[in-house]
Amino acid sequence: MAAWAERLSGVRGVLLDISGVLYDSGTGGGAAIAGSVEAVARLKRSPLKVRFCTNESQKSRRELVGVLQRLGFDISEGEVTAPAPATCQILKERGLRPHLLIHEGVRSEFDDIDMSNPNCVVIADAGEGFSYQNMNRAFQVLMELENPVLISLGKGRYYKETSGLMLDVGGYMKALEYACGIEAEVVGKPSPEFFRSALQAIGVEAHQAIMIGDDIVGDVGGAQQCGMRALQVRTGKFRPGDEHHPEVRADGYVDNLAEAVDLLLQHMDK
């Protein structure tokens, strides 16, 4: 008990991962993880600031929020920090015109972006779109550029759907890095800029915030690198070996979001 009180003291803001923490995606909209709907509601009734922080790149924010609302979650589009809008801002600021290797579900986020005569490649979780033809075209675009720029929406290895584990964008990103001899710019977790933008949105300093996620590297490690605390839930992509990871150790491990919220609210003012 004393250990938890020390780990959670002074927390004013909570960043929540979505996939694997709130719900598992999949056919029919996926399924809420037991206890997570009420856990989010309890957090939002508390004095704690809450921000949803996701690497979701198969759905637009609007579509993702719609799925979650239908599952019963209290969430709005403006409460979500996601990589596609952040990427669009970067593209505009730097005058980049992307060749897109992304899922059709997120393409609407790029409607205002100039894609003529591409001078970079943007890759996301394209799902079935990761064909040889599409990967090779992205490779060709990069190789034709004097200074190739590859932007990746996250770099996750895999995630969990209701039907099982699914390959994420990271493996495909690494293939293009290797083939082209370049290093991708990652927008999304574990990028420090991504976490900082989420914290800025709720007006909380890193040392006052805690991340709750299922990814030991992207969620936990990334948050800790920014000076935040982080809890790992034993849902979603969690594997038992995560608790013995050679490089990253969470500030605590909990069975699910409901347990994390119980602990946070119990020790909120201690």
Curated annotation (Swiss-Prot):
Reactions the enzyme catalyzes: diphosphate + H2O = 2 phosphate + H(+)
- Domain of life, per UniProt, equals Eukaryota
Q: Which InterPro entries match?
A: HAD-like_sf (IPR036412), HAD-SF_hydro_IIA (IPR006357), HAD_sf (IPR023214), LHPP/HDHD2 (IPR006355)
Binding-site residues for substrate, renumbered to this chain:
D17, I18, S19, T54, N55, K189
A single GO BP: phosphate-containing compound metabolic process
**Record-listed Mg(2+) binding positions:** D17, S19, D214
Please state the Enzyme Commission number of this protein.
3.1.3.-, 3.6.1.1
Give an example GO cellular component term for this record: cytoplasm
Q: Which CDD domains match?
A: HAD_PPase
Alphabetically list the UniProt keywords: Cytoplasm, Hydrolase, Magnesium, Metal-binding, Nucleus
What is its cofactor? Mg(2+)
Which GO terms label this protein's molecular function in UniProt? inorganic diphosphate phosphatase activity; metal ion binding; phosphatase activity; protein homodimerization activity
Q: Where in the cell is it found?
A: Cytoplasm; Nucleus
Q: How is the cofactor bound?
A: Binds 1 Mg(2+) ion per subunit.
Subunit architecture? Homodimer.
Family per record: Belongs to the HAD-like hydrolase superfamily.
Q: What does this protein do?
A: Phosphatase that hydrolyzes imidodiphosphate, 3-phosphohistidine and 6-phospholysine. Has broad substrate specificity and can also hydrolyze inorganic diphosphate, but with lower efficiency.
- According to UniProt, the name of this protein is Phospholysine phosphohistidine inorganic pyrophosphate phosphatase
Q: Which gene encodes it?
A: Lhpp
